[in-house]
Amino acid sequence: MQLTSFTDYGLRALIYMASLPEGKMTSITEVTQVYGVSRNHMVKIINQLSHMGFVEAIRGKNGGIRLGKPAADIIVGEVVRALEPLSLVNCSAEFCHITPACRLKLVLNQAIEQFLKELDRHTLAELVENNSPLYKLLLEDV
């Protein structure tokens, strides 16, 4: 299983914001420069993260983006569920004639649940706290 770039960059954006001093604002432009991703793509990601409460977006001259809640309260599994379409196969009778008797979907769903269960054990704070190499890579030019 591979996460979509949408989820990948969503997690990266959250990691970047969590690496900043608590409450510090950043901008979508700054995040896109750090990761070298399209601004349009990042705008869509930040909008989704904001809609889900993971990011707070403030408009205006002194506006910007920052975490919508403490990094310790952001569960990695919740972020992945919010951003990632988690269907591994297209199991509708329209696309596959064995759908009525197939057990593969059950097995794959169990695998996804175990994957998410593991991600639920980790917070955004765990990914960034006391991580000097990460701070250096992300924040040296900020």
UniProtKB/Swiss-Prot annotation:
GO terms for biological process: negative regulation of DNA-templated transcription. Binds 1 [2Fe-2S] cluster per subunit. [2Fe-2S] cluster binds at residues 91, 96, 102. Residues 2-129 form the HTH rrf2-type domain. GO terms for molecular function: 2 iron, 2 sulfur cluster binding; DNA-binding transcription factor activity; double-stranded DNA binding; iron ion binding. The keyword Ligase does not apply. Residues 28-51 bind DNA. This is HTH-type transcriptional repressor NsrR. It comes from Proteus mirabilis (strain HI4320). The gene is nsrR.
